[in-house]
Amino acid sequence: MAFQISPGVNVSEIDLTAIVPAVQTTAGAFAGQFRWGPVEERVLLSNESDLVSTFQKPNGTYFKDFFVAANFLAYADTLHLVRINNTGLVNANANAATILVKSEEDYDNNYSAGISGGGQFVARFPGALGNSLKFSICASNTAFESTLTGTCTVVNGNNGITFSANQETKLTKGDRVLLGPDNDVFTIHSVATGGKSAVLTASYTGNTVNGVAAPTRQWEFYNFVTRSPGTSAWASTRGGTNDQMHVVVVDEGGDWTNVKGQVLEVFDAVSKASDAKNEDGSTNYYVDAINRRSKYLWWAGHASGLSNAGSAAAGKAFGGAIKPDTQSFASGSDGSAGTAGQYQTAYDKFKSSEEVDISIIMAGSATAPTANHIIDNIAEFRKDCVVCISPEQADVVNNSGHTNAEVDDIVEFRNALTSSSYGILDSGYKYQYDKYNDQYRYVPLNGDVAGTMARTDEIR
């Protein structure tokens, strides 16, 4: 076969039908800032759907890192990704507490016995997205359904309701109240101090009713569970009582589903008993059920009304509040923009070739110091991978500082990089459509370059 002894273009014909791709695909690695997901922990992703379900959709602040990862996954199916621990990350909670639970490992090692100041639950991962969540606990038969004392009055076309007796101990926001001769369902928006009046979420339509006796109220999520919480078969055979409870997780703000009030998860008839089991042998203890199955919550502590919660079932009379415990999350924070040091710490998760097998590292929108850190401390150390780097956005996007400014600035950026056979520098940024926010974005090219390299490995 002829070969070239000077630079030129060589044209080859290759029959790809005879190529058998290697079983092991070319793995990429990346660290970035995201709205959700585990922090400082390697996560293996296979496609963009995995990326969205684990780290959530991009917004106007965190889109560059998202699309670098997404663009790589458009070509390849193996990406190890680490979310950086940027300053100010906070898990949303109902107690306005500053809490950071970074990952499942962090929870198991430091918080599985409870989270001081966290209330009953905290958001599973840090980020403002958690502020859209609320939870509701129904821990007793009375909280599920009860009869209000005294009488009530409702007027056609009015959203107010008055009571002859104080209902504060029985009625709470979100409760359903059955009104009128047909027991039409109306929802409580708020209960006045003193409990003798309340506001409905919608005006009452029907005949004005004066002095209706003992109206029925129900838990907000009455129709989402099979029955009132009572005693499970597990507790009953061991002499325990009233161990069952229901927990519902809701997208109150609509940030997860675009539907405010959408129910996300239902934990039906879970148990307050620490040793409770289902018929199939799986745990039914509410703490374990939520920690193992929820995508949105970690358990933080037992509510004060859950008497004997966390005890074994034998001989225990478990208790629960007489009205639902429904709380909205707040205080979750995305934090500030990540620093070079925080990105470098995240990239260090790829330093050991014994812990993770990678071939290409994407630098994203990294500055020269971070790109050098990746080359010098990871690629040069491992000697089995390369780093794909893009110049800074200001070097190549709307750079009109002077004639040939883009070329000069790219050269300056290159000269700030370590000279290494493990580094690859591309030409800049791409302008691509963000389908999640209906906008066009400038995104570093290194995700695409790394992706085409991985794809070439697969088909060649």
Language-model segments: which ranges?
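A glycine- and small-residue-enriched flexible loop/hinge signal that marks low-structured segments
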Residues: M1-T147, T151, S164-R460
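Short, structured beta-strand/loop micro-motifs enriched in basic residues and often containing a Trp
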Residues: N156-T162
